[in-house]
Amino acid sequence: GDTPSHMVMPAIHYSKEDVADLFESYTKQPEEPVITKEVKTSRRVMRPKFLSAEMGVSGANVAVAETGTVITMTNEGNGRMVATLPKTHLYIFGIEKFVAKMSDIRYIFKVLPRNGTAQNITAYLSFYTGATKVVTDPENDTKEDKNFHMIILDTPERRKIMASEDYKDIFCCIRCAACLNVCPAFRLVGGHVYGGSIYTGGIGTLLTSLARSQTYIGRWGTCSGSCSMATASWRAALAAPRADSPLLV
């Protein structure tokens, strides 16, 4: 499969013609390169899968240590269907997603939609705190407790980053992609060239290299122009890691 080219809009490199070809290869039916029709095709194919799924898997934009609440911000209804329709709901996120108190989330709510999609708030703002009820028999309105689980990625690599005076601010990144949108190198070559296997752009190269694999760290030196535009857009943008950094040894 393909890899994301942008943090907020991972498939932005696909044209409507590309999407039509992709849908045709999957559905084996003709597809016009018209966005409204492609949306209907996507809904027709995906809706039965949502309704029949036994488990939904979500990622968190924010997690609140005070209450155990996980929060997802999205403009797509499928995010809420994944969380509410299946009997089992699994959240997977890193420890860097935690804030201490519920009152702290307002800062992320203010910045993330504005920087990511130029909105005051996303269309869907979902809070999940523990297990809820799920309808298991619609005809009789029978409900059972949902299975709710969280996998929190607390890895040695993440701990090293958090303990580092040089690079701990990298976890201030909320994946809004503001730095990508102003980056001359990213706009020229795209996220498949400038970025890691998971996250894109300069900040994505750092995140992937420090938290998972150093394979992509060379792309920073190749693409970074040290123009400071990313730093101006968001304080989490950092200078290139030194070759002798203990995190890269």
Which role fits each region the language model picked out?
Residues 1-165:
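The feature marks the mature, well-folded catalytic cores of soluble enzymes
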Residues 138-170, 180-181, 186-249:
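Ferredoxin-type iron-sulfur electron-transfer modules in oxidoreductases and energy-metabolism complexes
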